[in-house]
Amino acid sequence: MPDSKLLYIFLLALVSIASGEKDAKHLFILSGQSNMQAHRPDEAFTPAVEKALGKDKVIVIQDALGGQPIHRWWKPWRDPEGQSPEQLGDLYDRLMNKVRAAIDGQKIASICLVWMQGERDARMGWGKLYEEALLGLHAQLAKDLNWKKKDLGFVIGRLSDFDMGNQKYPHWTLVREVQQKVADSHPQFFLVNTDDLNDGLSRKGK
């Protein structure tokens, strides 16, 4: 079954256990680096979830920036020597400012983080730190939104098959493996295989 259909089923399953409170909305938080930054939710993602859940039942927030490591979102991150980088969690704070403004006064039925990132960490050789950071980011978001961690959905876009030989990005395959492992670790997590998108074509097929 294509990933798009599996993802659709996953999202429906996620919201099926959500709060049934009247007027409650389903919150989708889209973040990551370049591929997420270039993504235009209004072209496909938002129409799809609105069709499935109702136009007035969905809140979609996107905030992403190309070329960034995960430590610009996950605040406890430390490098292999135990040092803290200068830019730590600043993009997470920027994202959360948007999220809090969007949900102010709203009743929330479900929350799902849609994450497309990992290239920079693979390039820097930080793959061994990525599992803790990925799980930590999910937990950090759940805590800050006062949401049960086990109920917060997590859709992870896996790195494509761009550098399977680890020639330019020494931890490319390691980060891919970590993303798969994390996605398999919880029923509320889902992996999107992006290997078929590494064809050089734009969203217009050119």
Cite the ranges covered by each PLM segment.
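Cell-envelope and extracellular/periplasmic
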Residues: 21-206
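Bacterial N-terminal signal peptides that target proteins for export
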Residues: 1-7
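Serine/proline-rich low-complexity intrinsically disordered segments, especially terminal tails, linkers
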Residues: 6, 18-21
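Hydrophobic h-region of N-terminal signal peptides that target proteins for export
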Residues: 11-19
